[in-house]
Amino acid sequence: MAEGEITTFTALTEKFNLPPGNYKKPKLLYCSNGGHFLRILPDGTVDGTRDRSDQHIQLQLSAESVGEVYIKSTETGQYLAMDTSGLLYGSQTPSEECLFLERLEENHYNTYTSKKHAEKNWFVGLKKNGSCKRGPRTHYGQKAILFLPLPV
């Protein structure tokens, strides 16, 4: 390819017969580490479950600005948040602890970094057993921080 040329590819939705993306619809965040779906329970606990029928895994992602998202449970109405010690929890109201930087990685998974703690590179992560991984224990390259947004 010569410098300045643009190459276009056919839409993947045609090749794989996928529905066009609708970001208004709830998503499931599937974690590469252990095969868990991110879940926000009514008591504010955040963990992972392999039960795809669990209503608490349906999450609404909404953009605050380019690359910045809020992640809200459609069932409980709580927002995913990360406190000052790096613990994930469900918050009733959106705050700066609820804002995450969403990044599409080369392997097509997404990562979510706490915007408030961006200088520390604290990611949303799940351990193999489905429990939350604290922000300070996460780092780039771990499977625990890789999430695949799936349709409900």
From Swiss-Prot:
Residues 127-143 are annotated as: Heparin-binding. It is found in: Secreted; Cytoplasm; Cytoplasm, Cell cortex; Cytoplasm, Cytosol. The modification N-acetylalanine is found at A2. In the nucleus, phosphorylated by PKC/PRKCD. Heparin binds at N33. Disulfide bonds: none annotated. Residues 2-15 form a propeptide. One of its GO terms (cellular component) is cytoplasm. Keywords: Acetylation, Angiogenesis, Cytoplasm, Developmental protein, Differentiation, Growth factor, Heparin-binding, Mitogen, Nucleus, Phosphoprotein, Secreted. It comes from the Eukaryota. GO terms for biological process: activation of protein kinase B activity; angiogenesis; branch elongation involved in ureteric bud branching; cellular response to heat; fibroblast growth factor receptor signaling pathway; mesonephric epithelium development; neurogenesis; positive regulation of angiogenesis. Its main location: secreted. GO terms for molecular function: fibroblast growth factor receptor binding; growth factor activity; heparin binding; integrin binding; S100 protein binding. SUPFAM superfamilies: Cytokine. PANTHER family: FIBROBLAST GROWTH FACTOR (PTHR11486). Monomer. Homodimer. Interacts with FGFR1, FGFR2, FGFR3 and FGFR4. Affinity between fibroblast growth factors (FGFs) and their receptors is increased by heparan sulfate glycosaminoglycans that function as coreceptors. Found in a complex with FGFBP1, FGF1 and FGF2. Interacts with FGFBP1. Part of a Cu(2+)-dependent multiprotein aggregate containing FGF1, S100A13 and SYT1. Interacts with SYT1. Interacts with S100A13. Interacts with LRRC59. Interacts with CSNKA, CSNKB and FIBP. While binding with LRRC59, CSNKA and FIBP seem mutually exclusive, CSNKB and FIBP may cooperatively interact with FGF1. Belongs to the heparin-binding growth factors family. Plays an important role in the regulation of cell survival, cell division, angiogenesis, cell differentiation and cell migration. Functions as a potent mitogen in vitro. Acts as a ligand for FGFR1 and integrins. Binds to FGFR1 in the presence of heparin leading to FGFR1 dimerization and activation via sequential autophosphorylation on tyrosine residues which act as docking sites for interacting proteins, leading to the activation of several signaling cascades. Binds to integrin ITGAV:ITGB3. This is Fibroblast growth factor 1. It comes from Sus scrofa. The lineage of its organism: Eukaryota, Metazoa, Chordata, Craniata, Vertebrata. The gene is FGF1.
